[in-house]
């Protein structure tokens, strides 16, 4: 499925898939699919628990998905606990170049007593800059400040609203 799984300390759960691969005149083509059911990946102190969903590639090179797909997990532990992350997406051809783009229709995660959602957007491998909008709902500021642990910074209350973010190759602007 991914060479990155070889870097994990452990992978458990049900994972099955298949591929139809063709090589013609040195060009790789074909399709592939994978189903994940309650897959947990561990690496050191980081865990992604309960990943479920189906990945269905209509084309391997460059990769394109067969329609919209959803992946979900029970939780992610990476310095903090992220609850019930979900991602609804497709990988599609880009109008900006030969590499595909990730079209995110919905993404959501529970954090700091609230939730953060990514509004629909495109992440294009052909572009250096991306603008995304996060929708924050009931995120506890004290918990959030404890997570990021910036010395001398504290806050109380809840954070809700839209947060625009601009990402360039080497900078992030909020």
Identify the role of each PLM range.
Residues 168-172:
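Mature extracytoplasmic or organellar-lumen-exposed domains after removal of signal/transit peptides
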Residues 1-42, 53-167:
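Extended amphipathic, helix-rich lipid-handling scaffolds
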Residues 47-49:
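Extended intrinsically disordered, low-complexity coil regions enriched in Ser, Thr, Gly, Ala
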């Amino acid at each position: 499925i991914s060479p990155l799984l070889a870097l994990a300390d452990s992978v458990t759960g049900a994972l099955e898939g298949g591929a139809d691969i063709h090589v013609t005149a040195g060009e790789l083509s074909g399709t592939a699919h994978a189903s994940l059911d309650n897959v947990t990946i561990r690496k050191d102190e980081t865990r992604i628990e309960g990943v479920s969903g189906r990945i269905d590639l209509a084309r391997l090179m460059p990769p394109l998905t067969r329609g919209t797909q959803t992946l979900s997990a029970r939780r992610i532990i990476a310095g903090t606990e992220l609850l019930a992350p979900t991602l609804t997406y497709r990988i599609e051809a880009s109008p900006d170049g030969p590499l595909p783009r990730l079209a995110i229709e919905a993404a959501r995660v529970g954090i700091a007593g609230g939730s953060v959602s990514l509004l629909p957007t495109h992440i294009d491998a052909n572009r250096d800059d991306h603008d995304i909008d996060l929708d924050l709902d009931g995120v506890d500021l004290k918990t959030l400040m404890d997570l990021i642990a910036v010395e001398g910074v504290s806050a109380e209350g809840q954070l809700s609203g839209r947060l625009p973010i601009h990402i360039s190759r080497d900078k992030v602007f909020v």
